[in-house]
Each structure stands twice: as structure tokens, then as C-alpha cells.
């Protein structure tokens, strides 16, 4: 299936309500539609079109870490994929802010907070923010 089943629509001048309704119906048949101002489309594309590559890098790095910690590669990849898929499903199904889920699974002095500290130390959050911003800026350049 599709990685992301949402489409963004920006309406140009001269598109009447009837035409908008027809287009909405067409896209609703294949997934959710979001109506955005045209100025926001580059950010939308950066997150939804480039985002899968960023998440794939995270999945690969997590699997590499598990291999370094002793798991066989095939198992590490399978577990990494399932962890990411399960996390995304949980965030979506329970409508959680990512920080809520992080706090739910992080115990004082435990393994998860040790890993979170390591990620904060190396700047993972900043790196991901910069990746999305860079992709949006490049999208604007290509327009």
C-alpha cells in the first residue's frame, strides 16, 4: 500500500465550488484529502514525500544498533520495521502526541531514557528538523 494516503489540494483562481466538490470526491475515494494554502505545499511534500526516506534511515540505523548489540541482521531489520510500524499505528490510533508516547514507555533510570539521552546528545531531533526544512527549501527552488 501507499506510505501516506493523503493528498494535499491547493485551489487556483477560477475553480468553482462544484469543481472543488468533484475533485474532493475523486481524491476521497483513494484516501484523505487536506486542503492547504499553496504556500504550505512545499512543507507538506517535504514531510510526506521525503519523510519515508528519513524514516527508512532511522529504521536502518536502529537495526544496525541491534546488530551491534548482538542480534542477527534479518531479525534486527524485522524488529526495527515492526517497531516503527507499531509506533506509528499507536500514535495514530490513540491520537497521541509523540512526547506522550515517549513518556509512557520511559521509566526513571531505565534503558529507554538512556537511549533518549544518547539521541539528544548527538542531535537526532535537530537533524530530522533540518532534513525536513532542507527538503521544503529544495522543493521551493524546484517550483
Predicted regions and their residues:
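Short, small-residue-biased leader/transition segments that mark boundaries at the very start
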Residues: 1-4
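Internal alpha-helical scaffold of NAD(P)-dependent oxidoreductase catalytic cores
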Residues: 6-44, 55-94, 138
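Aromatic-residue-lined binding/catalytic grooves and analogous aromatic/hydrophobic interfacial grooves
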Residues: 51
Amino acid at each position: 500500500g501507499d506510505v501516506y494516503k493523503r493528498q494535499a489540494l491547493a485551489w487556483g483562481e477560477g475553480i468553482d465550488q462544484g469543481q472543488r466538490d468533484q475533485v474532493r470526491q475523486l481524491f476521497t475515494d483513494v484516501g484523505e484529502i487536506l486542503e492547504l494554502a499553496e504556500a504550505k505545499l512545499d512543507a507538506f511534500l517535504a514531510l510526506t514525500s521525503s519523510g519515508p526516506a528519513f524514516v527508512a534511515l532511522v529504521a536502518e540505523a536502529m537495526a544496525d544498533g541491534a546488530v551491534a548489540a548482538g542480534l542477527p541482521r534479518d531479525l534486527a531489520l524485522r524488529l526495527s520495521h515492526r517497531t516503527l510500524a507499531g509506533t506509528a499505528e499507536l500514535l495514530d490510533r490513540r491520537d497521541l502526541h509523540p512526547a506522550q508516547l515517549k513518556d509512557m514507555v520511559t521509566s526513571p533510570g531505565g534503558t529507554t531514557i538512556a537511549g533518549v539521552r544518547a539521541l539528544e546528545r548527538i542531535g537526532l531531533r535537530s537533524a530530522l528538523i533540518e532534513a525536513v526544512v532542507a527538503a521544503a527549501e529544495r522543493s521551493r527552488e524546484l517550483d
